[in-house]
Each structure stands twice: as C-alpha cells, then as structure tokens.
Swiss-Prot record:
The keyword rRNA processing applies. InterPro entries: SSU_processome_Utp11. It is found in: Nucleus, Nucleolus. Its main location: nucleus. Keywords: Nucleus, rRNA processing. GO terms for cellular component: nucleolus; small-subunit processome. PANTHER family: U3 SMALL NUCLEOLAR RNA-ASSOCIATED PROTEIN 11, U3 SMALL NUCLEOLAR RNA-ASSOCIATED PROTEIN 11-RELATED. One of its GO terms (biological process) is megagametogenesis. It comes from the Eukaryota. This is Probable U3 small nucleolar RNA-associated protein 11. Involved in nucleolar processing of pre-18S ribosomal RNA.
C-alpha cells in the first residue's frame, strides 16, 4: 500500500521567495543553504571545543625539541633552516648530479634542434622535378616555355595553404626557442662547472682585464701550478 501511496501525484511545495518589500536585502536563504551554514558552524564549534580541552589538559612543564627547532611566523610553525646540513663532499656530489642532469638536457635539446633544422631545410630547399620537353620548331618551344612559366607562377608561395604556412612558422618559432634554451642551459652549466672548480683545493686568483688575452664578459681564474709527485 505504501507504494500506491507514494505513487499518488502531490502538489510540489516550493520555498517562498523574498517578499517584494524586502527585495533590497537580497535573496532569501533557502533550507539547503541553512544546512550548509549550520554544518560549517557546528564543525568550527567542535574544533574550538577540542582545542579548549587540549589547552585545559596541557602540562606547563612539557618540552619538545620542536620547540627550539622551529619558530612561529604569523601563527604558523616553521622549521628553522639548518645551516650545515651537508658536508662539503656531499654538496660537491649533489652539484655533480645537477650538472649531469643539465648536460643531459643540453644534449636532448641539441638532438631536437638538429632534427627540426633538417626538416625545415628540406622544406626550404626542395629539389624541383625534372621534365624533358621535345619541340619540333621555335613556335612550339615558345609555347612550351610560356606554359612552364604559368605553371611555376601558379605553384608559388601565394598558393601554399595557410595551414601549411602556420605550421612552418610555428616550427621556426619552436626552433628559435630551443636554441635560446640551449644557450641558457650551456651558460648555467659553465657557471656550475666554474663554481665546482673553485671549491677544489689549490691557490687561485681572478685575472684582471689587462691580463686576459681573449677578452670575455665572464670571470677568468688562474690556478697556481703544483708540482706533481
């Protein structure tokens, strides 16, 4: 019987809208909005209750090492930075791994540049097809020449589809971006290699501009010669 009772069509009870006199106060809160707001309120209320309970049971003499190894910034605990976390040898090993990763990136980019350049070079320097014509007299030669000129003019750059033009322009932009990326990576690799060499033992000094034979914007160092055993 319950299924029959539920099958009877009933009037849909709609929630009332905001009265005309209170339209200036905005939309009237619906029941589903009230449920969301009430859940959020009770959740915050429960969190505050638990925090108050923790504070009431707190031992004033308790101590954790995190109390001296961290500090609060805007009410949030932040761990203090460790000054000498790694030794010199460990730092050297980490930098060597980073240099290997950068070198791998340079080699990968150079391969992509080579592949892209060869593809664009083939598009720009496409060899024309050869066709041999046989003519009986001068008039026929002139006619064939005019026909070839018309055909070559119709196959010019203006008749290339715009889709192909856009794709070629995009490939040239990609090639230029990859070349710039390789330059940046090579500069970064050179800087890291220099810093690694400067960390090694041995007396060294930075050369002045008048001592450098090949002028460069980068710093140049000279190591003192050591006698090999």
């Amino acid at each position: 019987m319950s299924s029959l009772r539920n099958a009877i069509q009933r009037r849909a009870h709609k929630e009332r809208a905001q009265p005309e006199s209170r339209k200036k106060f905005g939309l009237l809160e619906k029941h589903k909005d009230y449920i969301v707001r009430a859940k959020a309120f009770h959740q915050k209320e429960e969190t505050i209750r638990k925090l108050k309970e923790k504070a009431s049971f707190r031992n004033p003499d308790e101590f954790y090492f995190k109390m001296i190894n961290s500090k609060t910034v805007d009410g949030i605990h932040r761990p203090k930075p460790e000054a000498n976390k790694y030794t010199e040898d460990e730092l050297m090993l980490l930098k060597t791994k980073d240099m290997g990763y950068i070198l791998q990136g340079i080699q990968s980019e150079k391969k992509k540049i080579e592949k892209l350049s060869s593809m664009l070079h083939e598009l720009d320097n496409k060899r024309p097809n050869k066709h041999v014509y046989f003519a009986e007299d001068r008039e026929e030669v002139k006619e064939i020449q005019s026909r070839i000129e018309q055909k070559s003019s119709s196959l010019g750059l203006d008749n290339i589809p715009s889709r192909i033009k856009r794709k070629t322009a995009s490939s040239y932009r990609e090639l230029e971006e990859r070349k710039q990326r390789v330059q940046k990576l090579e500069k970064l690799y050179a800087d890291m290699a220099l810093q690694k060499e400067l960390k090694k033992p041995g007396r060294k000094r930075k050369l002045r501009e008048d001592e450098i034979e090949n002028q460069t914007s980068r710093p140049v160092y000279k190591w003192r010669a050591q006698r090999k055993r």
